[in-house]
Structure formats: C-alpha cells, structure tokens
Amino acid sequence: MTDRIVPATLVFREDGTVVSPLYGDIYHSAAGALAQADHVFIRGNDLPERWRHKRTFTIVETGFGTGCNFLATWAAWRADPSHCERLHFVSVEKHPFARDDLRRAAAHIVAYTTIEPLVDALANAWPALTPGVHRLEFDEGRVTLTLAFGDALDVLPNLALRADAFYLDGFAPSKNADLWSPAIFKSLAKLADEHATFATYTSSGAVKRALDEAGFAYRKVEGFAGKRAMLVGEFAPRWRVRRHEPPRALDVGTRDAIVIGAGLAGCAAVERLAARGWHVTLIERRERIASEASGNPAGVFHPMIARDDNLAARLSRAGFLHALNRWRALEHAGHTFARSAHGLVQLATSADEFELMRESVDTLGVPSELARTLSRDDAQALLRTDIAHGGWLFPQGGSISPAALAAAQCAAAGDRLSRIAGVEVARLERGGDGRWLALDASGATIAQASVVIVANAADAARVAGLRHAPTQRVRGQLTLLPPGSAPAVPLPAIGDGYVVPLANGVTLTGATYEPDDADTTLREAGHRENLERLERLLPAFSAHALDAHALAGRVGFRCVASDRLPLVGELGDEAAAARDAAALTGARLRDVPRAAGLYGAFGYGSRGLVWAALGAELIAAQIEGEPWPLERELAEAIDPARFLIRALRRGRVA
C-alpha cells in the first residue's frame, strides 16, 4: 500500500522567509527566493541557453517546496523568444502544501513581480494530495509540470524520463540527509541524458562524494547571496552506471500517425498527438465516430478505492484525475460536451461492505475532494430516494456523453486530423522505408504513417497480429426507462449496477455482463436483469412495474484483458522475441524487443472514460521521449508486452 501524503505546514519567519517546522530549515534564502532560483538553478544549469531551439527540454527537481523554482523557470521560458517548444518540469515532493497554503507561500514570495499571475495558475491547477504522479499543463500544454508526491527514495526509481537538467534543492543535508543520500544520486543517474547538467546550493563533502560515485562531475562556483560556494556539473560517468537507457523520442522522418478506432481510446490519442503537432489519420470501420461501446447515451466516471491501494485502484485514481484535467482543458478551449457537475454516489450492497468502505477512506487518508463517506441518511438525502446503505460520494465524479467527448477531442485536433470512415483495417505491414501500412482485406493500402496506434478494442490484437494479448469481448446491454418510471435521482449512483439521470427525463440503467456473447439485439432477459439490479440499488423502484419487452436500450461490447487491466503503450515485437526466446526467459519488460512505432490502446473494459485520456498521454509521451505521466510500475502493469514476457518466462514463445 502506498503511504498517505502528509501536507507541509506553512510557517513564516519574522523576516518573511518560509520555514519548515518538520525539518527546521528554510525553503529559500532570506535574500530572495526568485533571485536564488535564478542564480543557483537557472544560471547554474546554463539556462536559458541550453533549451533554445529544442523540441523538448526536461528539468528534474528534488523538492518542490513553495514552487518558486518552477515559477522562476516558467517565467524565464516565457521571456525567452528562442525557448524550446515544450518545457517539462518534473518535481518530487514528500510533503506538498495544501492548495491554499501553496497559494499564500508562493504569492508572498513573488509579490509585486511579473510572476504574480503564474501563482494563480499554479494554485488553481494544484492537484489533490494523493500519492503518485500528477500532470499539470500550462500555456496551452507547452509547459508541463509533473508532480510526484511521495518519498524521493521510492519515487525517483519509479519515474520514466530523460532529464536534461537537475535542480537539487532539498533542505540542507544536515536537516534532511535522505534526500542527499547515494541512493538518490544513483536514481538520478538512471534518468540523466548524456549531456545532463545539475546545480545545487550545497557544497558539502558528503554530497560531492555521492555525486562522484553516481557518475556526476562537479565543480565549485560562487554561491548565492554571499555564500562562498555552490556546486554545478554534468553527468559524466567513468564507467557504466545503468543497465537500461532512459527513454528517447521515437526516431521518425515524418511526424504523422494512424489511429485505428474512433472510440474513446482512439479519439483521445488523436487529440494528444495533434496537440504536439502530429498529423493524424483516424480510420473507423463505422460511418461515425463513437459508434461502438463509446456510443452509449452516457457513461459514469469515478476512481476505484481499495483498502490496499492496489494497482487497479492507483491506475483508476491516476486516470480519473488526469481525465478531469484534460476535460477542463478542452472546455477552456471552447469545446463543449455534456457532463454532470454534482458528483456521483457509490452505494454499499450490505452493512459489512459499508464498514469496509468507511475504513478504506480513513485508512488511506483519501482527500475529501476525491471521496468522502456518506451515511445512509446523508446518501438518502442526496439521492432523494430510499436506499438500504450508505457509501461514498465522489464530488468530481459523474456522468458524461462519450460520443460528445470523442467529438470534442476530434474538433480540438483541427486540421491536423484526417478521417477515413466506413473502412476496416484488416492488417498492418511495415514497408521497406520503415513506415507502417494499414491494409484492407484485399491488401490495398488505406493509409501509411510513421506511427500506428491500434485502439479498436477487441479487434486490436488481430489487426496488430498479436498472439500474446489475451482479451475477451463482453456483451453489455443497457436499459432506458421512460420519464416518471424510476426514482428521479439528481445525480448518478452506482453499486450493484448504475443509474444515470439523462437530460430528457429518461433514466439510464445497466448493464449486463455477458462474456463471449456476440448478439447485438436487445433481449427482454437483459432488460429484466437490469431492472432487478436497479431495484436492489434503489428499493423505491419496482422491477415488476414495467413491461421489460417494451423498453428501449442499447447493446455494446467491452474489450477486457485476462487480468482486467488495459493494454497501453508500445507493442512487443513477437517475431523478434521468438527468435531470441532462449535469451529472454529471465528478461524484464525493458528487455523485450519492440515493434518500433506500433502502439496499443485497448482493453479498457468498462473504464474507458477513466483510462483513455491517461493512456493517450502515456503513448504520446513515449513517442515524443517526454516524461511519462505515471509511475513506471503502473505503466508496466498496463504494458501490452506484459503477456509476452509471461509467455517467454514460461517457455511458450516459439
């Protein structure tokens, strides 16, 4: 289980500097936080000169604190007309400030400067204080702040990125020795680009020894505000210090991509690539986007909570929070889509389950902005109908129109998107020039590009030619209830099934779960099952009061992997793995040969709304060589090659 986040306590000294009572040290020099950031970290890493005319530039910071280093760097990037196209700032923080405290601390530091407006932007975007990686975007996505909340000893080895510069800015080594330990510098060495630099205000002997042992060359330069010396330097290992190289951008001649499948997964990928300047061809076998499972009238979105905070729970939390950020960005850009705004309730199915739910929230220290426990009376008042048990309220959860969201994502791509509808891709082939060809059943080329993303659910593995990607097609039938026939709940509720109020007074409920059933027709038995489930969820509803045969509904099909997690990322090269099978029996995922330029985004099951945006961002980051938007452990849990590596270890690849 991941450790809960303990926020920092905001304390000001008489001279106005921010101090940590936990560590007994100041966050910045009394001579000025912004001046210190400029002298030590920006100039200490030869910025802005080193980021000029680059596509991306990545800075890694140990200790976010008040955010003044990020704010100063962002301001310097804005002021430089030759800045890199995309600036990535990745910062690790064990004790982040709560939003209001961060706003107060940062506003105090930058008062009466041109940086003041940036503080509001940062504070407004500040995430819930939950463990893990949080990605925030500013200046239309050209500046990205990736926050990693947790102990640096645990977090740094779990990051996937290639760093161009390091800001080493923890509290003094005498106050917080862990952040200056050899283990920290070894982790940084595994992230460093071959030309990476670093800067730090300290010049202690222990830090110099740890830097040297990790492969960093250092030199003393004049310190800040009368301090005699500080350290700067570069990554210059005299021996091999890492087994695997940090991720690089995909080497392509032309920045164009094919996305197969115009559902939630595919349209999210289109938007993320187009935002980075890629030209994308979207191929959909139907005439319209979101015609399969993504065409449901509404879908619910919420994170999972598990007492042990397992992989699925962490992934759903990361996906949920990332999706909210992406949707807000779309709305801010003027793209509209219907989504509810008053939260979502998850109801327990028994008194024992309610106690487990309550204990889970308390044990994990879940922030109230993410979820909070509701008593039976509170839940009943919120839903305005009788219920049997309490549960959770997800204040930011709710329902959304998947088709409208997909349309907004395509609209955001603008003229970087080309669509091919009513055409089915039968297979993929790599041309002699290394580009991918999408072929129809006759072998004719539909489109070609440097990159292909298969996002067509249960057909993805077949189109990509994968043998080791076990997915299952699961039929789901939902039911539409006419106005006045069900309790008029004001917000979505889930538990044993779900109920969603639609704008026209119709109530949506469902859905059945029928593996390996390809029937596309509505069935009375399916409606009856949904009605009985709704009766258990909302006892005031009578399943027998309606004629199930006369009800409207819809049938869709989920794509579910054997381990119930999605398949997202670069696909394995199964042919190459078969040739080297004997050497790969003890391999790790990073050792598996990959089909360069071929990616997957499928197997989302019933959680496409929660996982699609994060999956698209992960693929875009992998293609561009950017910091990944989630921990490596989580990325490996959804890596499409995980099934291939399992087969290799069992000697089942030939």
Curated annotation (Swiss-Prot):
Region annotated tRNA (mnm(5)s(2)U34)-methyltransferase, chain positions: 1-236
Signal peptide bounds: none
Keyword Transmembrane: no
Entry cofactors: FAD
Assigned EC number: 2.1.1.61, 1.5.-.-
Catalytically driven reaction(s): 5-aminomethyl-2-thiouridine(34) in tRNA + S-adenosyl-L-methionine = 5-methylaminomethyl-2-thiouridine(34) in tRNA + S-adenosyl-L-homocysteine + H(+)
Keyword check for DNA repair: no
Domain of life: Bacteria
GO molecular function: flavin adenine dinucleotide binding; oxidoreductase activity, acting on the CH-NH group of donors; tRNA (5-methylaminomethyl-2-thiouridylate)(34)-methyltransferase activity
A Gene Ontology term for the protein's cellular component: cytoplasm
Subcellular location: Cytoplasm
Name recorded for this polypeptide: tRNA 5-methylaminomethyl-2-thiouridine biosynthesis bifunctional protein MnmC
Role description: Catalyzes the last two steps in the biosynthesis of 5-methylaminomethyl-2-thiouridine (mnm(5)s(2)U) at the wobble position (U34) in tRNA. Catalyzes the FAD-dependent demodification of cmnm(5)s(2)U34 to nm(5)s(2)U34, followed by the transfer of a methyl group from S-adenosyl-L-methionine to nm(5)s(2)U34, to form mnm(5)s(2)U34.
